Amino acid sequence: MDGFDVSQAPREYQAVKPLADLFVLGMGLGWVINYVGMVYTSFKERTYGMAIMPLCCNIAWEIVYCVFHPSKSRVELGVFAMGLLINFGVMYAAIIFSSREWSHAPLVERNLPWIFCIGVLGFLTGHLALAAEIGPSLAYSWGAVVCQLLLSVGGLCQLLCRGSTRGASYTLWLSRFLGSCCTVGFASLRWMYWPQSFAWLNSPLVLWSLAVFLMVDGSYGVCFWYVEQYEKSVLMGRATKAM
């Protein structure tokens, strides 16, 4: 068993499959809310919410596992397909408004469409190469780990580098964080009840990645609060001077 075809799962996993599907739906709901929220925020604030490289990596991963190596689980495939469609909207908004964030770097500002295209192509071929190297089932999970770490670290770095909550919100953070936590729950069930194929999820590197995700994404909320308070203090200072 390669761990990708759920119909081949042992009876122990089949018994908890409804709960696993619930986690998958939770993951999908969280990320759909996040993607829709990012598109809305991008057009409202004329900026982009997801850092460039994580966005390219994420959409490339979704293309690979919706088109080239689709899951045999209808629930999982449906969630990925919906996420991919909305993610194209995220990418479109990012291409339109990203130049407003790069006026300090003219070379980047003038070539952002090319940067997005090359980034997606690079990560797409990387995910395909990983699938060819270790098989789609393992590459699916390891590729998702890479996407998640890039999203977590990239999101925090973007918040701190901007020094502004522009393009971000508690809703975007929590939908992303809780959606990814549902992925952890789904993976935990596979590890516990399908060890023939998923015992490797208890490996040191996976546990390290989980710890980094929880630490970085958990600290995002704290950093967001501090940046928000700083913005409020600046506005109050300006209002006081104007009086």
UniProtKB/Swiss-Prot annotation:
Entry-linked Pfam families: Pyr4-TMTC
InterPro entries for the chain: PaxB-like (IPR039020)
Topology with respect to the bilayer: Multi-pass membrane protein
UniProtKB keywords: Lyase, Membrane, Transmembrane, Transmembrane helix
EC number: 4.2.3.-
Entry keyword annotation includes Lyase: yes
Chief location of this protein within or outside the cell: membrane
Annotated pathway: Secondary metabolite biosynthesis
Top EC category: lyase
Keyword Lyase applies: yes
Annotated compartments: Membrane
Any single GO CC term annotated in Swiss-Prot or TrEMBL for this entry: membrane
GO molecular function: lyase activity
Transmembrane feature ranges: 19-39, 48-68, 77-97, 112-132, 134-154, 172-194, 205-225
Protein role: Terpene cyclase; part of the gene cluster that mediates the biosynthesis of the indole diterpenes janthitremanes such as shearinine K or shearinine A. The geranylgeranyl diphosphate (GGPP) synthase janG catalyzes the first step in janthitremane biosynthesis via conversion of farnesyl pyrophosphate and isopentyl pyrophosphate into geranylgeranyl pyrophosphate (GGPP). Condensation of indole-3-glycerol phosphate with GGPP by the prenyl transferase janC then forms 3-geranylgeranylindole (3-GGI).
Family affiliation: Belongs to the paxB family.
Protein's name according to its UniProt entry: Terpene cyclase janB
